[in-house]
Amino acid sequence: MKALYPGSFDPLTFGHLDLIQRGSDLFGEVLIAVLENPSKKATFSCERRIEQIKNATKDIPGCRTIAFKGLTVDCAHENNADLILRGLRAMSDFEYELQVAHTNRSLNNQYETIFLATETHHSFLSSSVVKEVARFGGEIRHMVPEFIAKDLMKLNTN
């Protein structure tokens, strides 16, 4: 089975990587779809985020990374995905993700959304938290791969 894992991944965190690994173990194939959203100012370009993800997932079998614009269900359909994969850190994530899952089903009922609970030690992680800690010079190497930490440090020293 092929799972579509959509997101902005700005930047990719160890929480994302854990979900990708577990998705690969469960479904065999994970298509990581990086959202290109021109109305949202990204820290890293879409191309750079794709490079970061490809580097971070090179040892995870069945992973592929693409850019996408538009609706998640359209991306799933165009790439022959079987399901949509999403992670949950807290109850607040569930409320939002459930609404998105229902919206996706209303647009194309072919796609189920499968939720995986984040590992407890990653439950505090979000891309926003990582960027905030990095902005103030805090240690982030336990939150993101080393090369992403270096990318963020370069941005914050310029």
From Swiss-Prot:
Catalytic activity annotation: (R)-4'-phosphopantetheine + ATP + H(+) = 3'-dephospho-CoA + diphosphate
Coiled-coil region(s): none
Covalent S-S links between cysteines: none
Leader sequence segment: none
GO cellular component terms given for this protein: cytoplasm
Annotated site location: Transition state stabilizer: 16
Compartments in which it is found: Cytoplasm
GO molecular function terms noted in the UniProt entry: ATP binding; pantetheine-phosphate adenylyltransferase activity
Annotated keywords: ATP-binding, Coenzyme A biosynthesis, Cytoplasm, Magnesium, Nucleotide-binding, Nucleotidyltransferase, Transferase
EC number: 2.7.7.3
Gene Ontology terms describing biological process: coenzyme A biosynthetic process
InterPro entries given in the database record: Cyt_trans-like, PPAT, Rossmann-like_a/b/a_fold
UniProt pathway annotation: Cofactor biosynthesis; coenzyme A biosynthesis; CoA from (R)-pantothenate: step 4/5
Subunit structure: Homohexamer.
Protein task: Reversibly transfers an adenylyl group from ATP to 4'-phosphopantetheine, yielding dephospho-CoA (dPCoA) and pyrophosphate.
Protein's name according to its UniProt entry: Phosphopantetheine adenylyltransferase
